[in-house]
């Protein structure tokens, strides 16, 4: 649901039910937080969305695969820090 539709729906619900209490708002925020965390867990483990997996789960990328290879953005050598270039 788009943000505008969701806000309109929330507004209409508020008008129907009346003013909400602090506890109602707190419960709604906690509920949305739980839903967001669950959606994030599902997205990480969903095989249909491989780009959302954490880097440790991608088999084709080794942790030190880029060391000693030309830097992709600048075309120069890979550096450990700007002042300490890696020479290999």
Swiss-Prot record:
Domain notes: The N-terminal active domain blocks peptide binding to and peptide transport by TAP.
Species the sequence originates in: Human herpesvirus 1 (strain 17) (HHV-1)
Site (Binding to TAP1 subunit): 22
Coiled coil location: none
GO biological processes: symbiont-mediated perturbation of host microtubule cytoskeleton; symbiont-mediated suppression of host antigen processing and presentation of peptide antigen via MHC class I
Recorded GO MF terms: lipid binding; molecular sequestering activity; phospholipid binding; TAP binding
Gene name, Swiss-Prot/TrEMBL: US12
InterPro entries per record: Herpes_ICP47
Keyword Transport applies: no
Origin: domain of life: Viruses
Effect of residue 32 to G: Reduced ability to inhibit peptide-binding to TAP
Annotated stretches, region: Disordered: 33-88
One GO cellular component, as annotated: host cell nucleus
A Pfam family: Herpes_US12
Protein name, UniProt field: ICP47 protein
Quaternary state and interactors: Interacts with host TAP1 and TAP2; these interactions inhibit the loading of peptides onto MHC class I molecules.
Family under the similarity heading: Belongs to the herpesviridae US12 family.
Compartments, record wording: Host cytoplasm; Host nucleus
Functional note: Plays a role in the inhibition of host immune response. Binds specifically to transporters associated with antigen processing (TAP), thereby blocking peptide-binding and translocation by TAP as well as subsequent loading of peptides onto MHC class I molecules. Empty MHC I molecules are retained in the endoplasmic reticulum and ultimately directed to proteasomal degradation. In consequence, infected cells are masked for immune recognition by cytotoxic T-lymphocytes.
Segments for region (Active domain): 2-35
Sequence ranges of Basic and acidic residues compositional bias: 33-51
Compositionally biased region (Polar residues): 76-88
